[in-house]
Amino acid sequence: MRSLLLLVLISVCWADHHLSDSYTPPDQDRVIHIQAENGPRLLVEAEQAKVFSHRGGNVTLPCKFYRDPTAFGSGIHKIRIKWTKLTSDYLREVDVFVSMGYHKKTYGGYQGRVFLKGGSDNDASLVITDLTLEDYGRYKCEVIEGLEDDTAVVALELQGVVFPYFPRLGRYNLNFHEARQACLDQDAVIASFDQLYDAWRGGLDWCNAGWLSDGSVQYPITKPREPCGGQNTVPGVRNYGFWDKDKSRYDVFCFTSNFNGRFYYLIHPTKLTYDEAVQACLNDGAQIAKVGQIFAAWKLLGYDRCDAGWLADGSVRYPISRPRRRCSPTEAAVRFVGFPDKKHKLYGVYCFRAYN
């Protein structure tokens, strides 16, 4: 009995001596570090962070995944591939495409336009056909195998042009929702900050603040001056911040891209009222052109015409790609005459005929 008691005392003393350095009181947090021996078992990569195309074109969003074949459980689970689109404010993800084995599902406006490239067993690249203006943005490729998953993000850029817009009512008359619809009405979408920033780098200078797709209000200045941010300030995109989308009123910056059709100035023996202009285009198998179409023709096709003409929103404009005397002598631009009385018989008309 004494031998047993002595053995117990020795064991308790040994344990107290060896565990005292690592003991953590119950009221203190403990951090446990776990390190994988061979790194991640599943890796997803995009060969390009950004890809470029245009409206009506096709594009491949690159994405590949790599598995560790020696890892426990590798190959047991089916691979699940999911593509989502990130909203401009990064607060939501919009489902685009999901694939698991033979099961595939496409969502929303992407139905019939997207599929996996399938170039190899580890290829998760997504092909998008017949691109629309709304397809612009950032996409997330997510690959899942059992409990393992990884993601990569690819940005889809569209060739196009940013233009400022305000309606007949005048400047600073659009809340966010009206601004977005105004762009859609002119064959465009509300521009993102990245698109406005690229336009500013390309020389866009506009002294009126406008809505962007993330709900912010900004304007681009390449030539600082007193009424536009101050004469002694540096060039840049001025940021008014985020405003109430229902109550606050500003202009809007729109974005449009290539079109599938013909934009042209209608040769007509007389000048036209607005209603006569609309009918003249219809008689020619076309429709009166929209503001987005005149900007796309000017910027992307180099369209040049020194004749002021009616457009669908009731404005009168003309596009100049080759500045010259009496035709925008200082710069290439789409010149804005205004929103004249629609009964004035003083202008021609720009038409647009879509290709089937």
UniProtKB/Swiss-Prot annotation:
GO terms for molecular function: hyaluronic acid binding. InterPro entries: C-type_lectin-like/link_sf, CTDL_fold, Hyaluronan_bind_Proteoglycan, Ig-like_dom, Ig-like_dom_sf, Ig-like_fold, Ig_sub, Ig_V-set. Gene3D superfamilies: Immunoglobulins, Mannose-Binding Protein A, subunit A. Disulfide bonds join 63-141, 183-254, 207-228, 281-351, 306-327. GO terms for biological process: cell adhesion. Ubiquitously expressed. Keywords: Disulfide bond, Extracellular matrix, Glycoprotein, Hyaluronic acid, Immunoglobulin domain, Repeat, Secreted. The keyword Secreted applies. Residues 40-154 form the Ig-like V-type domain. The keyword Glycoprotein applies. GO terms for cellular component: collagen-containing extracellular matrix; extracellular matrix; extracellular region; synapse. It holds the Pfam family Xlink. It comes from the Eukaryota. Residues 161-256, 261-353 form the Link domain. Residues 1-9 form a propeptide. It is found in: Secreted, Extracellular space, Extracellular matrix. Stabilizes the aggregates of proteoglycan monomers with hyaluronic acid in the extracellular cartilage matrix. Belongs to the HAPLN family. This is Hyaluronan and proteoglycan link protein 1.
